[in-house]
Amino acid sequence: MVPWVRTMGQKLKQRLRLDVGREICRQYPLFCFLLLCLSAASLLLNRYIHILMIFWSFVAGVVTFYCSLGPDSLLPNIFFTIKYKPKQLGLQELFPQGHSCAVCGKVKCKRHRPSLLLENYQPWLDLKISSKVDASLSEVLELVLENFVYPWYRDVTDDESFVDELRITLRFFASVLIRRIHKVDIPSIITKKLLKAAMKHIEVIVKARQKVKNTEFLQQAALEEYGPELHVALRSRRDELHYLRKLTELLFPYILPPKATDCRSLTLLIREILSGSVFLPSLDFLADPDTVNHLLIIFIDDSPPEKATEPASPLVPFLQKFAEPRNKKPSVLKLELKQIREQQDLLFRFMNFLKQEGAVHVLQFCLTVEEFNDRILRPELSNDEMLSLHEELQKIYKTYCLDESIDKIRFDPFIVEEIQRIAEGPYIDVVKLQTMRCLFEAYEHVLSLLENVFTPMFCHSDEYFRQLLRGAESPTRNSKLNRGSLSLDDFRNTQKRGESFGISRIGSKIKGVFKSTTMEGAMLPNYGVAEGEDDFIEEGIVVMEDDSPVEAVSTPNTPRNLAAWKISIPYVDFFEDPSSERKEKKERIPVFCIDVERNDRRAVGHEPEHWSVYRRYLEFYVLESKLTEFHGAFPDAQLPSKRIIGPKNYEFLKSKREEFQEYLQKLLQHPELSNSQLLADFLSPNGGETQFLDKILPDVNLGKIIKSVPGKLMKEKGQHLEPFIMNFINSCESPKPKPSRPELTILSPTSENNKKLFNDLFKNNANRAENTERKQNQNYFMEVMTVEGVYDYLMYVGRVVFQVPDWLHHLLMGTRILFKNTLEMYTDYYLQCKLEQLFQEHRLVSLITLLRDAIFCENTEPRSLQDKQKGAKQTFEEMMNYIPDLLVKCIGEETKYESIRLLFDGLQQPVLNKQLTYVLLDIVIQELFPELNKVQKEVTSVTSWM
């Protein structure tokens, strides 16, 4: 009987859905209590039902309103005076969606190569900032080069060409970053994505605070709460550096010029500079609690913003001054458009290059307009000529101005309108083009495109290098036999590249440069090379010491007495080496400047003569060797020991200046050298320079030497074997490594590198090993959370951090429909105002200066502990004052203090700040470079398939 009654009760309970009613009563107790009271009053006081109907109508309206709208229905913004408008930038017109073609101007152009997109080639075009901000950024980048490039680069060479390329690359990177920042809506990213990540971070801190009572252990407890969800860069400092390297490599295709990633050495250098020397200290600076406090004060400070003490500086092109080349001598590979057009073979190569780029019609437009101008500028035009010109103009308009044309070139709208008006009008109006500027400006625009975009690209193309080496691709034997070495005359005779084109003329001789080698002034043995292949001897310069009175710098038949000459070496200078062996580098080498005063011709009525001669370090030893060969050794005139290994740079030559000056002065005092032709040539500006350019340590073709060793051993049959082996070992022995400066970034676990990588603030981050087993904590990040927008974030913080009472939480849920959109619109507006204040010129310069000091001023005194504590105290007070008084009355003063203290303590943990910084950095990188999301999806799909 009892089971039957129980079964009937369960069925009745299910039919009446009592569980649902009980759940409704639990969630809405106040509403259910009022509804129950109203129902009881209606039954007991049915005589007053007409009065109670007012309350029943109100309940019915509330239920209908709630059911019709639902919690997801939101009222629009009710503050009509506050409207947030995303930034409308002129940059977007120049680069719509970042896909504006440099030729036709079309969005997502499919005709021309992606490398022709203006953003991909010259992203700094029309990008201007205030001169003070530009100067601050330039100073930071100059310090990057001065601290991480020049210390080792100056030991290699003094040529600035490579550093100039690096400057352009850094400008390209900064310009791309600025342009991509301009394209995103910063307030929307902050409110929709960054704050959501911050909510997750706050939840972890709250959970950790519940487990520890002392603030000192809050950071470690929070790291344990993160568990396996801790960012990979936080495991250790080395993992952080490795992560930044990988991130930099991922960004290279988007932040470097096209084809720059093909140069592995350049990408490695830039990766180490950016990851280890820029990004790592910058993130340390941002995660520093002192920096966080400073930024919080700027954000929550309601006082009027500090006004600039100086007027706004003028706008200047972005980093133009920083990117100006320091190497004054132009590159030997540089060409001008005029030079290309003057040579048929170069013009043919250039047209092939344009054809590959899909832009041959750009050159065709220039040629067509030039021909058109020649015809239209004639004094008197007949009707037939005007008709022909009008037809030609119509072809130009249809071919290069219409949007549907495949050969469209982007012009300013007024140019297109003027050309269209003449092309569609009567033919006699074509003469108006003689005085109109539209066609001339179109021509100037296309000519600028050819000169500034395509000509530099052509100078780095395969077509141009084929032109340079067209004689070296299949060199004949005769070309090698004629001359094996190159002299300065090959370059001196080349006055104009457009006339004789010196590089291509001597290109066929390059292959024979490295055939014979010299070690310490002696020729290496001939190792039995194949007959007919390398059986020639490099042309040498025979020097004969003639004591006859033949003048080097004066008229003939005049006696010469070198003892009466006065010489001095006042300074060391730089000389651009034009020798063919170094034609690729064109390096600037240090030389001694020898001032010569000739006084030996006063007897015949001549005034003293003065001139200067520039001699290299090794030329002195060639002079000493040849003087010893002809005259024997001079015990009182000896050069210091020759430096074989190690840099012979400016500082080294400067230290040897006095010794070399004393050596020359003593040579002049020797009677047997008073009429020496060799010494006179050395001191003469045109006295046989090439005879002193002895190759002391040239390149050795080790491959051919090693191949020839067995044949040489068989031919020698043991004779003179020991000297041969010694010479062979000496020629093949690698030079001793030069002492290097401290590394750019940290690769090896040395004490010096550890000192740079680890610091007292962050130590070793979370100090986790890769194979450490970590506890699988509750994964907050996989939980379903319907928190979206600032209103929901405030409710979440109020519930989790400030522990608002239930009635206030329900009230906020009720007003969510009314005020959510309004609050979020106001928040976007407020953030935009704060960002505008932050990006004011004087504030931006101040932030850049702080960043500069944090990265480069390692030797300066950091902020004292008292200053940091004072800043932290001010931040806490500002946070306390930022909470509205109405909320304080609802939650209480004590709860307010504890909640603010919890948030403040969480921001004073450097490693936790670094965790939040990297999470936010990942979000920002994905917003700035959405292409990375596609790459990640492709990698994920491939991984899942495998």
From Swiss-Prot:
List GO molecular-function terms, semicolon-separated: phosphatidylinositol binding; phosphatidylinositol-3,5-bisphosphate binding
Q: Which InterPro entries match?
A: Phox_assoc, PX_dom, PX_dom_sf, RGS, RGS_sf, RGS_subdomain_2, SNX14_PX, SNX14_RGS
Q: Where in the cell is it found?
A: Lysosome membrane; Late endosome membrane; Cell projection, Dendrite
Summary of the tissues where the protein is detected? Widely expressed both in fetal and adult tissues.
Query: Which family would the database say this protein is a member of?
Result: Belongs to the sorting nexin family.
Function comment: Plays a role in maintaining normal neuronal excitability and synaptic transmission. May be involved in several stages of intracellular trafficking. Required for autophagosome clearance, possibly by mediating the fusion of lysosomes with autophagosomes. Binds phosphatidylinositol 3,5-bisphosphate (PtdIns(3,5)P2), a key component of late endosomes/lysosomes. Does not bind phosphatidylinositol 3-phosphate (PtdIns(3P)).
Q: Please give the name of this protein.
A: Sorting nexin-14
Provenance organism: Homo sapiens
Q: Quote the gene name from the UniProt entry.
A: SNX14
